[in-house]
């Protein structure tokens, strides 16, 4: 009976042991996926930080946005129509 262990008798294991092994495998598989997603996200954030630091520092040369520009355009359109 001493030669009967889980390692050399894996085909005739107890159903309870099979369930425990399956649950443990599923948990390890889920932990692997979670770790992969977590570290993948960290790598992506790090990549964007490196690319952002390589870009030149320049001020925006465009003029400030005109918030009332749409209203002025609408008023001019109404004046042309009337």
UniProtKB/Swiss-Prot annotation:
Taxonomic path: Bacteria, Pseudomonadati, Pseudomonadota, Alphaproteobacteria, Rhodobacterales
Keywords noted in UniProt: Cell membrane, Membrane, Photosynthesis
Gene3D superfamilies to which the protein is assigned, alphabetical: rhodobacter sphaeroides pufx membrane protein
Protein name: Intrinsic membrane protein PufX
Compartments, record wording: Cell membrane
Pfam families named in the record: RhodobacterPufX
Gene Ontology process terms (BP): photosynthesis
An annotated GO cellular component: plasma membrane
Family in the record: Belongs to the PufX family.
InterPro entries registered for this protein in UniProt: Intrinsic_membrane_PufX
Function: Associated with the reaction center - light-harvesting complex I. May play a critical role in facilitating the interaction between this complex and other components required for light-driven cyclic electron transfer.
Chief location of this protein within or outside the cell: membrane
The species this protein was found in: Cereibacter sphaeroides (strain ATCC 17023 / DSM 158 / JCM 6121 / CCUG 31486 / LMG 2827 / NBRC 12203 / NCIMB 8253 / ATH 2.4.1.) (Rhodobacter sphaeroides)
């Amino acid at each position: 009976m001493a030669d009967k262990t889980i390692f050399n008798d894996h085909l005739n294991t107890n159903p309870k042991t099979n369930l425990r092994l399956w649950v443990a495998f599923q948990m390890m598989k889920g932990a692997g996926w979670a770790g992969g997603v977590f570290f993948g996200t960290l790598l992506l954030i790090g990549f964007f930080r490196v690319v952002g630091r390589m870009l030149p520092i320049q001020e925006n040369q465009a003029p400030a946005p005109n918030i009332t520009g749409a209203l002025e355009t609408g008023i001019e359109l109404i004046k042309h129509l009337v």
